[in-house]
């Protein structure tokens, strides 16, 4: 026996002479790391032992408190080289950190009967116990939350405070909490995972070479499958502890066997080492090639994804159950919106459209409307009973198409208006001339009629008393003359609407002068209303036709008066300059307009005052004049509150 022990000492002396790694442990939680009968064991310890074998380093285990270990690992002169801690996913500690060892998470724990915690918002205003330095603490350092934080040294301390009602919630790592729950039956799990993390080996940032060796060994264990065996051993179903005594016996027997085999195996070490070096080089070359291929595939995938994400069009792939398999998330919400209609206002049903495309295997294209926007929808069949849906905004094309159609209608209307104006002008002139003659003749015949009536008291004109008949004739002449003048005014509006104005005839026009002239010419209509003017000094000037601008403002003032016909109105006219633009504004507190009327007020012959003699050409002519002046007419109106019209022109440059 003494000889055997001596042989073991001789064999193990080279091992003792090798470099060592001081591995700090603190946990009492199976199956990670815990002490039984003075011996530390667990997944982390056995994994570190295996890493030590691969790196030819002796592993020395030292147990301290968690806070002391965290403090030591931040100290480059500490006696602790490596510890195993949990780090939040996508958040590294300010330490040298290994690849993930094992996934875990943190949840909220409360007393039995308390409300469940569905998300972070449910913690607002609560007292929450957080373990100092733990991965929950690291996560919260970059994700501030609105709750009262209570720092504790251990999760178990947090559970004790919870029982004493000194905290409302404990956020704890799942392995530790699972061990503590049987000891605290009044505590329960109250949430799904709030934070995801992973166990890692960490060391001081100055020990990057050591961490590189640990990572290389860890990856070798994963590639060889030995890591999976360790995971199955320590994390298998129902396996939280191992029989330490039997393990010690097996390890002792194994040590004896290894010692005997080591003596024999040293003879072949040289040959094996050479073979391993060749094999390692081959594996390294293959690993480098695989990593390069993975990087290329990842770059291509990211490039393809970025191209799809950068498309202005919405692209979505769905199956026949309408499950969204992939999408670049551009405007995809429209497909499920109740405001997404066909342009003819028919209701759109995504499922019906998808099923039709899948059944016919033919592409589907439709023009759609969403609020004030227009879209083109395309649905194309692809493999595996799936379709790709394309959404492209076509608002601008729709507006251009409408503008083109309106321009065509207006061109036809202009030609028609010019012909009508010419044909109506001549007979209208004859009517006006004849009515003027009749009016003058009635004045001359009135004395003669009175003289004849005295001689013949029973004389009648058209069955009426001569005085009444003459009065009716005079009224009829006035009505005919007024109607003829109205016809003439409409004809002039039609001619003006049909004939474009020549811009070369424009001169410098003061907007203040336009307001003052329009006020004088509408004084009779505005005398029953309160007119207020706020004119800019100096007056903003534009290039244009003064008479046409007078006509525009006169028409707008008359419309404002008509809108305030049921009560004395307040009409405000102002001129000002903004962003190098000259602006003329007229505002009233009249009846206002609904949205349907507002959309049509510049259409030719559209009027809401047909019974009062409106022709529907006033605002059409105004709109045309403003466009000829390269201006813009903005109209805002609220039913029952009033209307504001702003005329915006380019400010003229004055010498």
Curated annotation (Swiss-Prot):
Record's bilayer topology term: Single-pass membrane protein
GO MF terms, alphabetically ordered: ATP binding; phosphorelay sensor kinase activity
Transmembrane segments: 252-272
Residue ranges occupied by any Histidine kinase domain in the UniProt entry: 419-653
Organism whose genome encodes this protein: Shewanella frigidimarina (strain NCIMB 400)
Source superkingdom: Bacteria
CDD domains: HisKA (cd00082), PBP2_HisK (cd13704)
Name the record gives this protein: Putative sensor protein Sfri_3689
Catalytic activity: ATP + protein L-histidine = ADP + protein N-phospho-L-histidine
GO cellular component, one term: plasma membrane
């Amino acid at each position: 026996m003494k000889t055997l022990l001596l042989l073991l000492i001789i064999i193990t002396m080279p091992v003792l002479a090798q470099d060592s790694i001081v591995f700090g442990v603190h946990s009492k939680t199976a199956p990670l790391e815990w002490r039984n009968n003075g011996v530390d064991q667990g997944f982390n310890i056995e994994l570190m032992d295996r890493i030590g074998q691969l790196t030819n380093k002796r592993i020395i285990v030292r147990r301290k408190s968690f806070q002391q270990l965290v403090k030591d690992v931040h100290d480059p002169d500490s006696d602790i080289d490596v510890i195993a801690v949990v780090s939040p996913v996508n958040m590294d500690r300010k330490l040298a950190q290994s690849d993930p060892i094992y996934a875990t998470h943190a949840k909220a724990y409360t007393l039995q009967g308390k409300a469940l915690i569905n998300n972070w918002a449910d913690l607002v205003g609560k007292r929450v116990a957080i373990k100092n330095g733990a991965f929950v603490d690291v996560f919260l350092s970059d994700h501030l939350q609105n709750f009262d934080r209570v720092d504790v040294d251990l999760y178990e301390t947090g559970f004790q405070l919870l029982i004493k009602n000194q905290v409302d919630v404990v956020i704890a790592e799942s392995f530790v909490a699972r061990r503590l729950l049987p000891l605290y039956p009044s505590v329960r799990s109250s949430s799904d995972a709030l934070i995801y993390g992973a166990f890692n080996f960490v060391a001081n940032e100055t020990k990057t070479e050591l961490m590189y060796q640990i990572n290389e060994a860890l990856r070798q264990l994963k590639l060889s499958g030995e890591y999976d065996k360790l995971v199955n051993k320590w994390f298998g179903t129902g396996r939280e502890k191992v029989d330490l005594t039997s393990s010690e016996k097996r390890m002792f027997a194994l040590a004896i066997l290894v010692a005997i085999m080591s003596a024999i195996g040293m003879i072949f070490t040289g040959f094996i080492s050479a073979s391993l070096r060749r094999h390692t080089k081959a594996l390294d070359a293959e690993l480098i090639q695989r990593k390069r291929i993975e990087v290329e595939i990842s770059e291509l995938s990211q490039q393809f994804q970025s191209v799809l994400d950068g498309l202005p069009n919405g692209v979505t792939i769905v199956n026949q159950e309408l499950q969204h398999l992939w999408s670049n998330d551009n405007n995809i919400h429209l497909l499920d919106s109740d405001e997404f209609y066909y342009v003819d206002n028919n209701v759109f049903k995504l499922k019906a459209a998808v099923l039709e495309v899948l059944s016919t295997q033919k592409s589907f294209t439709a023009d759609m409307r969403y609020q004030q926007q227009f879209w083109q929808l395309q649905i194309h069949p692809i493999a595996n009973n799936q379709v790709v849906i394309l959404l492209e905004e076509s608002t601008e094309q729709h507006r251009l198409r409408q503008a083109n159609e309106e321009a065509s209608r207006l061109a036809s209307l202009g030609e028609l208006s010019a012909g009508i104006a010419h044909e109506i002008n001549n007979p209208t002139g004859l009517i006006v001339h004849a009515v003027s003659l009749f009016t003058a003749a009635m004045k001359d015949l009135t004395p003669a009629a009175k003289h004849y009536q005295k001689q013949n008291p029973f004389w009648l004109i058209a069955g009426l008393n001569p005085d009444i008949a003459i009065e009716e004739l005079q009224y009829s002449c006035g009505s005919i003359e007024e109607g003829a003048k109205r016809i003439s005014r409409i004809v002039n509006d039609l001619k003006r609407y049909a004939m474009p104005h020549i811009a070369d005839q424009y001169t410098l026009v003061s907007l203040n002068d336009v307001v003052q002239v329009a006020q004088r010419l509408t004084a009779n209509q505005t005398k029953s209303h309160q007119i207020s003017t706020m004119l800019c000094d100096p007056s903003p000037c534009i290039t244009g036709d003064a008479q046409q601008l007078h006509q525009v403002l006169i028409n707008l003032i008359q419309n404002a008066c008509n809108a305030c016909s049921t009560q004395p109105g307040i009409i405000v006219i102002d001129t000002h300059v903004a962003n190098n633009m000259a602006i003329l504004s007229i505002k009233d507190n009249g009846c206002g307009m609904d949205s349907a009327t507002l959309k049509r007020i510049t259409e030719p012959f559209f009027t809401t005052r047909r019974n009062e003699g409106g022709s529907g050409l006033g605002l059409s002519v105004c709109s045309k004049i403003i466009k000829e002046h390269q201006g813009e007419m903005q109209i805002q109106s609220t039913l029952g509150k009033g209307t504001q019209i702003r005329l915006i022109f380019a400010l003229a440059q004055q010498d």
